[in-house]
Curated annotation (Swiss-Prot):
Annotated protein name in UniProt: Phosphoribosylformylglycinamidine synthase
Subcellular location: Cytoplasm
Taxonomic placement: Bacteria, Pseudomonadati, Pseudomonadota, Gammaproteobacteria, Enterobacterales
Chain's role: Phosphoribosylformylglycinamidine synthase involved in the purines biosynthetic pathway. Catalyzes the ATP-dependent conversion of formylglycinamide ribonucleotide (FGAR) and glutamine to yield formylglycinamidine ribonucleotide (FGAM) and glutamate.
Region annotation (Disordered) ranges: 304-323, 1000-1019
InterPro entries, sorted: Class_I_gatase-like, FGAR-AT_N, FGAR-AT_PurM_N-like, PurL_large, PurL_linker, PurM-like_C_dom, PurM-like_C_sf, PurM-like_N_sf
Enzyme class: ligase
Length: 1296
């Protein structure tokens, strides 16, 4: 084992936070220093040259002190027996740099602890603060890291002696293996294997448990029901399917695949042809697929990987739909118990304790969103939608006083994608078809996830909780998706016959499902499975839940094509078996010469005993709201701090929202980028205005008073959130229903039945809306011992509805931004509660630790439909200036958020809403506030009346310029406050979370910036005409120069980059680094090179540095790049990851010696912003005629801060006039202040060019916003092309 020092690992503020935590724990630690240390497992000793190469490869990040400070060593590494995602990616880079004798690289974190001697107990306490026990181990000596590379002989299969010991043997195995088998399932297995005349193996039992777990089989949703002694006519699933039977319109696939599919639009899908690799538009149907999953149990145990693999698993579901599909846009949501932010505890928050083995709600919301965002970011899918609810309270329920909340959290992951018409249905698996595992190797992780997630938290053994934690590698999943993309792009020649993702239960669930769904059996070889841990037993190899894997059936004649695609994308795969005629599973193990699995498929997936739920209805009545202690002014401040209401910027700016170039509506609204969007919208392609929209609805606390009302409200809220997009008819909307319940808890089962019936049998059929997809999680309860007391925390019945729809014109989407620049205006409330104004289970009751009695509900189904149809007319006719639905916090919050987005005031009169101001302002009945022009008010009110809404419409008042927020009732002042004050209250929860998680100085700067009342918002100043197409004369000559659109594994922004160059008149050619390294392509034939954005190698050795070193350490490829850069007629552009990569190639680029490096953002966080930049005077040929222009641009990076050697280096860079772009604030001043400057770069620098101007590198993404519709905000006068299109046309002009 070789040991090499790495870079300093923690920023100063992270060290300060660690020291603070030590102080809180009464540990006398005076200082902490941390640096990375690398361990290399080698097959043979490295030569001096190889060692020097490895050392250079592992030099990234800040420079090291010559010697680490003195102190006691605590070394934190991945848990022995596991392989970290960092290791997988770093080892790949080493191999691509010619270091083939490196078997594996791994990285640890070496802490040097200074201070008085601590006793052994205190050291253990300190070690616990420094590592995640679920994923990491602590050593006190560097040599102990040898354990990371320990190799074991394979363990043999075990047999369970039922023939000798009968039922007791199965019962013991059930406990030992954590199978979570029910008693009737044990009987079933005993009968089955006795009938086969043999003892089952442990792997067969484990496989059965996973395949038949509640998580995988959804037994409760398929159960028979008796309620209050009455047999119910339908299962839960049949009631959901009733929506499809009633309204099958536009649904192409439901209930039978990894995601549902509905009709989309005929558009030009942009991708490279297989023959020449040239990008072009392909006119075809882009149907819409939709899926929403939950990943609750893993997120409770270890939030980052739990949320990351939750998003990753859902993305795989989309990609594995039909015969292969394309994930496009994602969503993430969380329900947790109260945060109790240190120093910011709220009056409604009480600490009820928790089990040791799960983390706190604060930990979940600190780490979980980062994990979900990181996976989406690195994969290259924009996360555009979400929700965040907290609930934890002592409630007087139908069971008396009990604790209700989300100690077991909800972690929601979902999204939409596109699929070709001819790939919607899976193909036929022919006998002899090759059975393939695509993706990473098996590792001993995630064992038992299906069974573990089916238990209430606290029931399973702690070791099984450790075993069920998973690890994420989104860059690997991206490679696999690139393979799937190449396959579906082949159309009728697609080599994929059948595909499923590998999720819960690993291959033990995926492979039987694949062959069974294809009407076949399978014969497999265990030792052909890619395996990074050869010491695993057959059970561990077959059943582990290593992520980023798919199982496929491929025709033998197409294996050569499939192999070629995988090799180019560097996506590992293994052929592990063949499809058989007989529906039988046979798993051979050539190492031991036996068959760990030899069983008929119908034993595994046959008719296991059907569940019967015999339950009783119980529903709390609640208590009338006690108003004596409620002051309206105090209520407003409390509600503005409640996470469900409060600003969620800390959850949004960590997620890339612009990748693909097809995002037309993200969360951030208007020139002031306020996170209040009602829904997410994407364009269907890069050449059309058709699109897709998705929205969320959930009102879980209402279930504590009325199960069915809570479910109806979730559907209603999803509809009111999506209503301001141009959809057309209501039946175009399709829903995903995700049900979370504590099955078995008194009253909850019958409540679940009533809620499903309310939606599936009544509301959705009445609205003609289909629920073609969904998921359930039936173990939403946590048990633990608190002192001598047994405690339980039970979640409310929680239905999360996601609405999906095809959009006619993405430009018609209306946002909550109030307008004061359109003349006199009117604000109208459309109250679908029809004056009921119920306050039960609202934000108001929650912040006063009450529940209330009567909740909101869908009062009139016809009016809800009429409301949607009326909004569609108003949207199509462009009569709406602004729109925002009423939800958590009620009307007051709706108006406030609209005012925040418009940076303006409102004056309203609520007299028409009744005499109860509290109820009028804080009820959460369905509805919306719309802003219209004053002269159109009468017409709008008539249209609403024509749709049956006459009794729901109330004129409130108007939006006004300034900082007022005034609510009156007649002549009485009900509430008056500055809008800017409300804005800061609303922001405080996000600010406090950001301070805890990120650099607190940056968080403070952002909060301070929100107090600038003179902030003009994003604005534009152009020194050229963006409508002028300066490339048109050259395009007319029909000469299309070739641009090499260069990507490395993990790059994800190449398609939109190619589209921008294509529009400017280039032939954009797809060039993978593997093409250059293999000599299939060379740069000699290109005049232009663009290195694209993303996460090459997952950024593990510094952003873009691994990519650069794979060029620098390969002599032939290095010479090729150097020759290209030295040719006097070439152009080169590097964007984001490509910028970082090219900055590390500066020794090859003439005139680039002053270029900086790009390092970790000052905030120490990934930053996704829509930032204002100014084009500086520079030689850049890409920026010609743009100098002095100021305009917003997409920013998405974690390492974008300019790093120079010293002040002299910075001065030389400036004096050379090589700075091409700078961040400016909304006042147009160059800035280093966060977040206007999102990475902290000196002098606002964010793009530099070479002396000749032929090579330019920039961190922002012009290719994602070259279309006007792809800008989060833009001036209304812009046409199809945004001003950023000029960059690409400048390039075309330069080539003549």
């Amino acid at each position: 084992m070789e040991i090499l020092r790495g870079s300093p690992a923690l920023s100063a503020f992270r060290i300060t936070k660690l020291l603070s935590r030590c102080q809180d724990a009464h540990l006398l630690v005076s200082d902490i220093y941390a640096e990375y240390v690398h361990f290399a497992d080698v097959s043979a000793p490295l030569s001096a040259d190889e060692h020097a190469r490895l050392q250079r490869l592992l030099q990234y990040g800040p420079s090291l002190p010559e010697h680490p400070p003195a102190g006691r060593l605590l070394l934190v590494t991945p848990r022995p027996g596991t392989i970290s995602p960092w290791s997988s990616k770093a080892t790949d880079i080493a191999h691509n740099c010619g270091l083939s004798q490196i078997l594996r690289l791994e990285r640890g974190l070496a802490f040097s602890i200074q201070g008085p001697d601590l006793n052994e107990s205190q050291w253990k306490q300190l070690a616990a603060l420094l590592h995640d026990r679920m994923m990491e181990a602590v050593f006190t000596d560097l040599q102990q890291a040898e354990q990371l590379f320990s190799h074991h002989q394979p363990a043999p299969v075990q047999r369970v002696d039922i023939l000798g010991q009968g039922r007791s043997a199965l019962e013991q195995a059930n406990i030992k293996l954590g199978l979570a088998l029910a008693q009737d399932e044990i009987d079933y297995l005993l009968t089955a294997f006795t009938g086969l005349g043999r003892n089952p193996t442990d792997i067969e039992l484990y496989m059965f448990a996973q395949a038949n777990s509640e998580h995988c089989r959804h037994k409760i949703f398929n159960a028979d029901w008796v309620i209050d002694g009455v047999v119910q006519p339908k299962t839960l699933f049949k009631m959901i399917k009733n929506t499809f039977e009633h309204t099958p319109d536009y649904v192409l696939s439901a209930y039978k695949d990894n995601a549902a599919v509905m009709e989309g639009s005929q558009v030009g899908r942009f991708y490279a042809t297989a023959e020449k690799g040239i990008y072009d538009y392909h006119q075809e149907e882009a149907h819409i697929l939709m899926k929403v999953e939950t990943h609750n149990h893993p997120t409770a145990i270890s939030p980052w990987p739990g949320a990351a693999t939750g998003s990753g698993g859902e993305i795989r579901d989309e990609g594995a739909t039909g015969r292969g599909a394309k994930p496009k846009a994602g969503l993430v949501g969380f329900s947790v118990s109260n945060l109790r932010i240190p120093g910011f505890e709220q009056p409604w928050e009480e600490n009820f304790g928790k089990p040791d083995r799960i983390v706190t709600a604060l930990d979940i919301m600190t780490e979980g969103p980062l994990g979900g965002a990181a996976f989406n970011n690195e994969f290259g899918r924009p996360a555009l939608l979400g929700y965040f609810r907290t609930y934890e309270e002592r409630v007087n329920s139908h069971n008396g006083i009990e604790l209700r909340g989300y100690h077991k959290p909800i972690m929601l992951a979902g999204g939409l994608g596109n699929i070709r018409a001819d790939h919607v249905q899976k193909g036929e698996i022919t006998v002899g078809a090759k059975l393939v595992v695509l993706g990473g190797p098996s590792m001993n992780i995630g064992l038992g996830g299906g069974a573990a997630s089916s238990m209430a938290s606290g029931q399973s053994d702690a070791d099984l909780d450790f075993a069920s934690v998973q690890r994420d590698n989104p860059e690997m999943e991206r490679r696999c998706q690139e393979v799937i993309d190449r396959c579906w792009q082949l159309g009728e020649y697609n080599p994929i016959l059948f595909i499923h993702d590998v999720g819960a239960g690993g291959l033990s669930n995926a492979m039987p499902e694949l062959v069974n769904d294809g009407g076949r059996g399978g014969r497999f070889e265990l030792r052909d499975i890619l395996n990074d841990e050869p010491g695993m037993s057959p059970l561990e190899v077959w059943c582990n839940e290593s992520q980023e894997r798919y199982v496929l059936a491929v025709a033998p004649a197409q294996m050569a094509l499939f192999d070629e695609i995988c090799r180019r994308e560097r996506a590992p795969y293994a052929v592990i078996g063949e499809a058989t005629e007989e529906k039988h599973l046979l798993l051979n193990d050539r190492h031991f010469g036996n068959q760990p699995i030899d069983m008929p498929l119908d034993v595994l997936l046959g008719k296991t005993p059907k569940m019967l739920r015999d339950v009783t209805r119980l529903q709390a009545k609640g208590d009338a709201l006690q108003r004596a202690d409620i002051s309206l002014a105090e209520a407003v401040k409390r509600i503005m701090h409640l996470p469900a209401v409060a600003e969620k910027t800390f959850l949004i700016t960590i997620g890339d929202r612009t990748v693909t170039g097809m995002v037309t509506r993200d969360q951030m609204v208007g020139p002031w980028q306020i996170p209040v969007a009602d829904c997410a919208v994407t364009s269907a392609s890069l050449d059309s205005y058709y699109g897709e929209a998705m929205s969320l609805g959930e009102r879980a606390p209402v279930a504590l008073l009325d199960f069915a009302a809570s479910a109806r409200l979730a559907v209603g809220e999803a509809l009111t959130n999506i209503a301001a997009t141009q959809i057309g008819e209501l039946k175009r909307i399709k829903l995903s229903a995700n049900w979370m319940s504590a099955a078995g808890h008194p009253g909850e089962d019958a409540g679940l039945y009533d809620a499903v019936r309310a939606v599936g049998e009544e509301l959705c059929p009445a609205l003609e809306i289909t629920i073609p997809v969904g998921k359930d999680s039936m173990s939403m309860k946590t048990r633990w011992q608190e002192g001598h007391e047994q405690r339980e925390m039970t979640s409310p019945l929680s239905l999360v509805i996601t609405a999906f729809a095809r959009i006619e014109d993405v430009r018609r989407t209306v946002t909550p931004q109030l307008r004061t620049d359109k003349g006199d205006n009117a604000l109208l409330l459309i109250d679908l509660g029809a004056g009921h104004n119920a306050l039960g289970a609202t934000a108001l009751t929650q912040v006063y630790r009450q529940l209330g009695d009567k909740p909101a509900d869908v009062r009139n189904v016809q009016q809800l439909a009429g409301f949607f149809n009326a909004m569609q007319r108003l949207v199509a006719d462009q009569h709406l200036l602004a729109y925002h639905d009423r939800s958590d916090g009620g009307l007051l919050v709706t108006l406030a958020e609209m005012a925040f987005a418009g940076h303006c005031g409102v004056t309203v009169d609520i007299q028409s809403l009744g005499n109860d101001a509290l109820a009028a302002l804080f009820n959460e009945e369905l509805g919306a506030v719309i802003q219209v022009r004053a002269e159109q008010r009468a017409d709008v009110e008539k249209l609403l009346a024509d749709h049956g809404l006459a009794n729901c419409v109330h004129y409130l008042g108007r939006a006004v310029a300034g900082d007022t927020f005034d609510i009156r009732s007649g002549t009485d002042v009900v509430y008056s406050e500055k809008r800017s004050t409300l804005r800061l209250w609303w922001a405080e929860t996000s600010w406090q979370m950001q301070r805890l998680r990120d650099n607190p100085d940056c968080a403070d700067q952002e909060h301070q910036a929100k107090q600038d009342e003179s902030d003009p918002g994003l604005n534009v100043k152009l020194t050229f005409d963006p409508a002028e197409d300066i490339a048109a004369p050259f395009i007319l000559k029909q000469a299309r120069p070739k641009v090499a659109v260069l990507r490395e594994q993990g790059v994800n922004s190449h398609v939109e980059m190619a589209a921008a160059f294509h529009r400017a008149g280039f032939d954009a050619v797809d060039v993978h680094m593997s093409d250059l390294l293999a000599g299939r392509t060379d740069l000699q034939s290109f005049q232009t090179l663009v290195a694209c954005g993303g996460f090459s190698y997952g950024d593990v050795l510094g952003a873009g540095e691994g990519w650069a070193k794979s060029i620098l350490f390969n002599d032939r490829v290095r010479d090729e790049f150097e020759a290209f850069f030295h040719r006097p007629t070439t152009l080169a552009l590097g964007v984001c990851n490509g910028c970082q990569m090219m900055s590390n190639l500066r020794e090859l680029i003439p005139g680039a010696e002053h270029w900086p490096r790009f390092v970790r953002n000052l905030s120490d966080s990934f930053e996704a912003r829509f930032s204002l930049v100014e084009v500086a005077s520079s030689p850049s040929l890409f920026m010609q005629d743009m100098v002095g222009s100021r305009m917003p641009i997409a920013v998405s990076h974690g390492e974008g801060q300019v790093e120079v050697r010293d002040a002299a280096h910075l001065a030389a860079l400036e004096q050379s006039h090589l700075v091409a772009l700078r961040f400016v604030n909304n006042h147009g001043v160059v800035t280093e202040q966060y977040p206007a400057n999102p990475n902290g770069s000196a002098n606002g620098i964010t793009a530099v060019t070479s002396v000749s101007g032929r090579a330019t590198v920039m961190m922002p993404h012009p290719e994602r916003v070259f279309r006007t519709v792809s800008n989060s905000w833009h001036p209304e006068e812009w046409g199809e092309d945004s001003p950023w299109m000029r960059m690409f046309r400048n390039a075309r002009k330069q080539l003549g």
